[in-house]
């Protein structure tokens, strides 16, 4: 039976439960334990796939094609374990499962209720996702006191009651606000948050106290006294300059030791080696170079919509001790402009998106990068914009477009995928009338790279696998015509049916590459990703006047 650490949050949302949980997981992993993580989200959507990026932020895609909360991105950036749809559970999915069972007659005529049927299904999902690991960390979304979270909190209360403290730990993240006028930290919100938890039968074992500054020992003792938590289990989590330094901070305060002791894992663990995290922090704090990258997107007012893209760009810089400064630009604002917003930029990235708003701005951005020899990296919709740009302005296919934006286009160089093969070999189909949710080409897919191309050079191998999330794809009817006009198709699906990567010849442009996949989902601070490392390197070379630079590794 896998020991479980349940992570809850109180007082306010967005305190960083995911970062805190992932940081602890990375320490336990460094101590030799096999670790996994899980997110329980209280919203009624089955998954975030159809939610607005402005409301929810990024939809993070796993290898098996699950559309999940962006916190799973945090988890995979901190631990080596690759997660799946089992690791992301919503209220919507729980109710969907229970109602399906009720319709089948699985409950034998019983009245289906929150307790025990909903809570049992939550516990079943937890057991399924965590089996076979030495320890699992499970984050409960939302804030204690939210009505939506109650079934999840009741389920984890039951788990603790049945398994005991040696198999279940409660960790509560709470806010200790600093009141400038009084010049002091206030512990009362934390006391009330714990009181709320205790009212539903949960006594925290550990408190993580988020604050602008370190919580002094006197305040920690006060919190311990009023919350019935051991003083050494009241952990200070002050604001820090580098988030990837959080594992080092939690290790310093001995949070991992609390877990080892409570779960009696002493015989399984070794000393924690966090040298990789120390190297990451050092690279962030002591860069040798810096570049300015423009990100031209549709949802830049809510930058969490591009969380993995921003992190992957920074990771690409870390591998070269280069600080990456991001300039966020709204694609729609560039339509019909003189593109002066892209002056003094060392590289341009156009990320994914959906719908016609801002698409012409992305096409215009591709044209600017192509004509001005600025390194260009297109991802998903950014690749489709690059293809449309090339078709219109180089291949003379006037009014070329994507059928997503113009179904009457005389040259639909981008069209709806109606059939594709999944990573498991199954064939999936869809049409214009299919539901939006869960009907895209999703998950890890292999692709073969063309020898002698930029993509093959950057990746360093012939076959690579990337995660996908898209409905539209390069129209194969235009392959030959665009290749004859000079466009290089450097990556294709293994069955040769789908175009995965396009680029410009090196004699036409120093670094212009666009891919249909989402490589940002496989980038980590410790390893980076070949495409992002190559893109940042190209930006450095542009800044240096086109000189080849020797890569400085973190």
UniProtKB/Swiss-Prot annotation:
One GO BP annotation is:
pyrimidine nucleobase biosynthetic process
Task: Please name the InterPro entries in this protein's record.
Answer: Class_I_gatase-like, CTP_synthase, CTP_synthase_N, GATASE, GATase1_CTP_Synthase, P-loop_NTPase
Which residues bind ATP per the record? Answer: 14-19, 71
Q: Which CDD domains match?
A: CTPS_N, GATase1_CTP_Synthase
Active site annotation, chain numbering: 380 (nucleophile), 518, 520
SUPFAM superfamilies annotated for this entry? Class I glutamine amidotransferase-like, P-loop containing nucleoside triphosphate hydrolases
Identify the residues that bind CTP: 13, 146-148, 186-191, 222
User: Which residues participate in Mg(2+) binding?
Assistant: 71, 139
- The question of whether Transmembrane helix is a record keyword is answered with no
Family stated for the protein in its record: Belongs to the CTP synthase family.
Descriptive protein name: CTP synthase
């Amino acid at each position: 039976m896998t020991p479980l650490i349940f992570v809850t949050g109180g007082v306010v949302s967005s305190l960083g439960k995911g970062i805190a949980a992932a940081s602890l997981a990375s320490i336990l992993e460094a101590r030799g334990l096999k670790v996994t993580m899980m997110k329980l989200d209280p919203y009624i959507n089955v998954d975030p796939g159809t939610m607005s990026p402005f409301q929810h932020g990024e939809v993070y895609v796993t290898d098996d094609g699950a559309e999940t909360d962006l916190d799973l991105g945090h988890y995979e950036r901190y631990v080596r374990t690759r997660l799946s749809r089992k690791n992301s559970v919503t209220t919507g999915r729980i109710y969907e499962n229970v109602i399906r069972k009720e319709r089948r007659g699985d409950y034998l005529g019983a009245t289906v209720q929150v307790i025990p049927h909903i809570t049992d299904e939550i516990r079943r999902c937890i057991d399924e996702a965590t089996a076979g690991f030495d320890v699992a960390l499970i984050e409960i979304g939302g804030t204690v006191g939210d009505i939506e979270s109650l079934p999840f909190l009741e389920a984890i209360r039951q788990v603790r009651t049945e398994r005991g403290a040696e198999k279940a730990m409660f960790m509560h993240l709470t806010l200790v606000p600093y009141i400038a006028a009084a010049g002091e930290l206030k512990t009362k919100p934390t006391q009330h948050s714990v009181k709320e938890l205790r009212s539903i039968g949960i006594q925290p074992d550990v408190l993580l106290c988020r604050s602008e500054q370190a919580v002094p020992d006197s305040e920690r003792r006060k919190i311990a006294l009023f919350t019935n938590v051991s003083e050494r289990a009241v952990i200070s989590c002050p604001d820090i300059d580098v988030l990837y330094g959080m594992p080092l901070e939690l290790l310093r305060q001995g949070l991992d030791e609390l877990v080892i002791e409570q779960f009696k894992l002493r015989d399984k663990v070794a000393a924690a080696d966090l040298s990789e995290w120390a190297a990451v922090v050092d690279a962030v704090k002591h860069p040798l170079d810096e570049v300015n990258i423009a990100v031209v997107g549709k949802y830049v007012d809510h930058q969490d919509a591009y969380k993995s893209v921003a992190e992957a760009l920074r990771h690409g810089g870390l591998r070269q001790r280069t600080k990456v400064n991001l300039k966020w630009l709204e694609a729609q604002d560039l339509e019909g402009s003189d593109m002066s917003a892209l002056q003094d930029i060392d590289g341009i990235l156009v990320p994914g998106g959906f719908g016609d708003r801002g698409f012409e701005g992305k096409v215009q951005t591709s044209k600017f990068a192509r004509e001005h020899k600025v390194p260009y990296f297109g991802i998903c919709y950014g690749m489709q914009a690059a293809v449309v740009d090339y078709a219109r302005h180089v291949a003379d296919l006037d009014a070329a477009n994507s059928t997503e934006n113009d179904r009457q286009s005389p040259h639909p160089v981008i069209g709806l995928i109606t059939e594709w093969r999944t990573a498991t070999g199954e064939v999936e189909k869809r049409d214009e009338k299919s539901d939006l949710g869960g009907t895209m080409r999703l998950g890890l897919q292999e692709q073969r790279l063309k020898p002698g191309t930029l993509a093959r050079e950057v990746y360093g191998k012939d076959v690579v696998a990337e995660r996908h999330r898209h409905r539209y794809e390069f129209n194969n009817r235009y392959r030959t015509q665009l290749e004859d006009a000079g466009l290089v198709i450097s990556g294709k699906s293994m069955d040769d049916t789908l175009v995965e990567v396009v680029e410009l010849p090196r004699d036409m442009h120093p670094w212009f590459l666009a891919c249909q996949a989402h490589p940002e989902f496989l980038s980590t601070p410790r390893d980076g990703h070949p495409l992002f490392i190559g893109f940042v390197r190209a930006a450095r070379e542009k800044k240096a006047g086109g000189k080849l630079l020797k890569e400085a590794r973190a």
